[in-house]
Amino acid sequence: MYKKQIFCFVGETNSGKDTIVNKICEMDKRFSTVVSYTSRPKRDNETDGVEHHFVDSDTIKDIMDKRPDDVVAYTKISQDLSSSGYEYLATIDELDKGNIYIIDPHGIEYLRSKFGDIYEIIAIYIYTPLEIRRKRAKNRSDYTTEFAKRVENESVQFDHYYRHKKYDYIIYNIDGCLDAAVTTVYGLLTYIIGGGLRRECTSALGNIYTKKEIYDGLTYLKMIFTYYLNNFTSRTLILEDIQKKYEIMRNIILSHLK
């Protein structure tokens, strides 16, 4: 049974996940974000209906009360000790329109448990060290009690998420190079939608791989290993088990070229 793939991106505050996702959606129209509802104010560089649907808290409450079965995720983020915080909510109709969703770890588990029979939920964790995230916050003039509070709130949640390997893929953005991160994540996504990593383990059972799937696999490997050959002293973007995946995919490709 075919399931639509939903790529769920998770990462701590200022990890770069929003920038990575936005650049990928600009590069390739096969990818589009799930537009959630939020009660936070719209920023100057945002457009209603693009980044979010900007609504008030009453509208979000109304959706939750009248359409509870349509709610796929809900998050409330406190800004400081004196604030009631902002709310974020996503509905199943918005999930049907997009295939990339920026979400928190708890939201992924909820999606898998409630909608796993409808969607293939693929979790991608963007890991960026705290020092780099703190530097970004300072550069963007939002290094305030808000950032410190969010870091504190996220530490337990993401530590559990990381230690128990709730993700499918993890990108280590060690030195904070977003351009390289975009290249790697884009290669990974095109590889997956072409059938790549998710079907490697069944290749021995006689799966027939299309030219498109082989091309996507080669493209992904080329992008990853070209980067490493040109930047072999860097520790940026270490994809887990990449050498093993390379050998598996290489053997699959060679078998089709015989």
Task: Report the location of each language-model feature.
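Hydrophobic anchor at the beta1->P-loop junction of P-loop NTPases
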Residues: 9
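P-loop (Walker A) phosphate-binding loop of NTP-binding proteins
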Residues: 12
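ATP-binding Walker
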Residues: 15
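Walker A/P-loop
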Residues: 18
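Conserved phosphate-donor/acceptor-positioning beta-strand/loop module used by diverse small-molecule
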Residues: 100-104, 118-138
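Small-molecule kinase domains that catalyze NTP-dependent phosphoryl transfer to phosphate-bearing small molecules
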Residues: 142-231, 237-239, 246-249
